[in-house]
Amino acid sequence: MLPRVIALLTGLGLCALAQAKPTQYPLTVENCGSTLTFAQAPARSVTIGQAATEMLYALGVGDKVVGTSLWFNNVLPPFKALNDNIERLANNEPSFESVIAKRPQLVAAELEWVVGPQGVVGTREQFHELKIATYLLPSDCEGKDNRVGADGTRLEPFRVDTIYKSIRQLAEIFDVQDRGQQLNDELKARLAKSVATVHSKGLKQASALVWFSSAEMASDPYVAGHKGVPEFMLQTLGLRNVVQSDEEWPAVGWETIAKANPTVLVIARMDRRRYPADDHEQKLAFLRSDPVTRNMDAVKHNRIIILDAMALQASVRTFEGLEQLATAIDGYDLPK
């Protein structure tokens, strides 16, 4: 594995030297079942979902964003000044009216349940009838059925290539292909670095659980299923997910989790406060006091890793989350 990682890093350095071609308009893009045509780069965009927002910021087109919404964490520090000057339409889901009031030429959405067939903000057709293009991040529609389960059900395992595809397509839409290529190269290098960090651990027996949130502290937690982004992160670093549901974030009882006795617990940190368990401090207090959870090995040995919620979603933060997860795992004495 390690020689391949080194080869990948070397290859990325060479790839960065090649320049991408400028966009030829009109541009046609196939996106999550819709065919989009752009006569020119969008001058005004609204984002619904932090992953879409920070992806546009990372591509250097934040000056084209006129409204944001659906936040889990504070914006990445390098983008704070930029983000402070852009209107936040809502902390959670915005209204359809508030989005179209910004007169966007493009709505970039992270999740199909906000803009899709049963979109809580609106359907793609509603926006398209107003000549507003909609772009959905492929990570939430490819290999996934969002009609099944509270947060959708994966028909096939999440592929990290869908993140690279989002970046590549958005870069083409906004005519910033060089930056898109550079960003993808940077993210691939971070992925390779994370794998190299835990390479010597040779993990085969270690397991993990990823706890996102809970509607109530005492209710069944929303945890990562075995085909989503967290599963990709765990598998990449040699950990086995104790949850085998195809749902994105199924609710699983603590008794079932305790019986599986994961080696490591990963908990999401959020700045939003929709549910009590959005607060990671409350998560920690619960784990250490509840009679069922406090006897799990991960709790007794303090093998609890805190990651930003957005690192557990398909986003540019996924790779930072992988680095943090790899560093934490490298510091543990885990079964091999």
Task: For each feature predicted by the language model, list its residue ranges.
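Short helix-initiation/N-cap motifs at beta->coil->alpha
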Residues: 29-33, 87-97, 140, 246-254
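Second-shell loop/turn segments in exported
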Residues: 42-43, 85-86, 110-114, 149-157, ...
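Extracytoplasmic ligand-binding site segments that recognize negatively charged/polar headgroups
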Residues: 114-122, 132-169, 201-229
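Bacterial Sec-exported substrate-binding components of ABC uptake systems
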Residues: 5, 9, 18-54, 156, ...
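Short helices/loops that flank or line small-molecule/ion binding pockets
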Residues: 96-103, 121, 252-261
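Alpha-helical, coiled-coil/dimerization segments enriched in small aliphatic residues
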Residues: 73-74, 85, 220-249
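Structured C-terminal subdomain patch of bacterial secreted/periplasmic proteins
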Residues: 157-166, 267-336
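A short, structured surface patch at a secondary-structure boundary
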Residues: 44-117, 239, 273
